[in-house]
C-alpha cells in the first residue's frame, strides 16, 4: 500500500502540537502538504512544532467547540484526528472529561469534516479497545469488554467513524495505537508513559522503577511507525474505510 501524493494537499491535524501529532505534522510538511493544525495547547507544546512552524497554519482551539472544528476543516481534503485525552489512569479519575473530549470532540471533528466535504478522516483509536480479551495475537473482531472510560471513548470513536462512513459517505480509518513512544513524549506528571519515565530515570543515573515481578509484557510502537501508519491509512483503498 503506497503513501499517497501529498504535495500541496490541504490537510488538517488535530492535536498537531502534541506528541504523535507533531511528528505527523513534520512528516506531512516534509512531503509538501499544506498543513493546518488545530490544538488547544492544553497538553501540546508550541516547541513541538519548532521544526515546521514556518510552514504550518496554527489554529488555537478546542475540538469540543464545533465552530472551531468547522473553521479548521474548511478547505481541507484530508484530516488526521489526533487530539484526545490519552491517559487510562486519568480517565479512571475523571471519566466525564475523557468522554467529553474524546467522544464529543470526535463527533464534532467528523461532523465538521462531513460538512466541509473532506474526503477522508484518519483518526487515532487505541489498543485499549481490545479490553479484557485474552486472545493473542490481537485481531479485529476479537474485542473484549472495555476496562476503562478511555477504552469506552475510543470504542465509541470507532462506532462514530463507521456510522459517518455508512450514513454520510465520509471515508474514515481508525488506527489502534499500541503504547506509542519516542521523542517529545513527556516523562513528567502523574500520567506519564512508562518508556519516557524509564529513559528519564536512566538519564539521572537511577534504576527504572518496575512494579510487580518484572515478568509482565507490553507491546510498544515507535512514534515514526505510528506516523507511517497514518500516511498509509490516508492512501488505503476506499473499501477499507469505516473500520479500525
Per-segment meaning from a language model:
Residues 147, 178-192, 207, 212-224:
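Glycine-rich "substrate-gating" loop/helix at the edge of Rossmann-like oxidoreductase active sites
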Residues 105, 136, 187, 208-209, ...:
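Short, polar/charged, Gly/Pro-enriched helix-capping and turn/loop motifs at alpha-helix termini
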Residues 13, 120, 170, 188, ...:
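Generic signature of intrinsically disordered, low-complexity, basic-rich segments
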Residues 69, 187-191, 237-242:
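Short, charged helix-to-loop "capping" segments that act as catalytic/coupling loops
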Residues 180, 196-208, 220-244:
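Alpha-helical substrate-binding/gating segment
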Residues 1-180, 224, 230, 234:
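N-terminal Rossmann-like NAD(P)+-binding domain of SDR-like oxidoreductases, especially those catalyzing
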Amino acid at each position: 500500500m503506497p503513501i499517497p501524493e501529498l504535495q500541496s494537499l490541504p490537510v488538517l491535524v488535530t492535536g498537531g502540537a502534541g506528541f504523535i501529532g507533531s511528528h505527523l505534522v513534520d512528516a506531512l510538511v516534509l512531503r509538501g502538504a499544506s498543513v493546518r493544525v488545530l490544538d488547544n495547547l492544553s497538553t501540546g507544546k508550541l516547541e513541538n512544532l519548532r521544526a515546521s512552524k514556518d510552514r504550518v497554519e496554527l489554529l488555537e482551539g478546542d475540538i469540543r467547540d464545533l465552530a472551531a472544528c468547522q473553521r479548521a476543516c474548511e478547505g481541507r481534503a484530508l484530516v488526521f484526528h489526533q487530539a484526545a485525552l490519552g491517559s487510562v489512569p486519568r480517565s479512571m479519575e475523571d471519566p466525564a472529561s475523557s468522554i467529553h473530549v474524546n467522544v464529543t470532540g470526535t463527533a464534532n471533528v467528523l461532523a465538521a469534516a462531513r460538512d466541509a466535504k473532506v474526503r477522508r478522516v484518519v483518526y487515532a483509536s487505541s489498543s485499549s479497545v481490545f479490553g479484557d480479551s485474552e486472545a493473542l495475537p490481537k485481531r479485529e473482531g476479537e474485542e473484549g469488554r472495555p476496562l476503562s472510560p478511555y477504552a469506552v471513548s475510543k470504542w465509541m470513536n470507532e462506532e462514530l467513524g463507521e456510522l459517518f462512513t455508512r450514513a454520510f459517505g465520509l471515508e474514515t480509518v481508525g488506527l489502534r495505537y499500541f503504547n506509542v513512544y519516542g521523542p517529545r513524549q513527556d516523562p513528567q506528571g502523574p500520567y506519564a508513559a512508562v518508556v519516557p519515565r524509564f529513559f528519564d530515570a536512566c538519564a539521572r543515573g537511577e534504576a527504572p522503577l518496575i512494579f510487580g515481578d518484572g515478568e509482565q509484557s507490553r507491546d510498544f510502537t515507535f512514534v515514526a511507525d505510528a506516523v507511517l501508519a497514518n500516511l498509509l491509512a490516508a492512501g488505503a483503498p476506499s473499501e477499507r474505510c469505516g473500520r479500525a
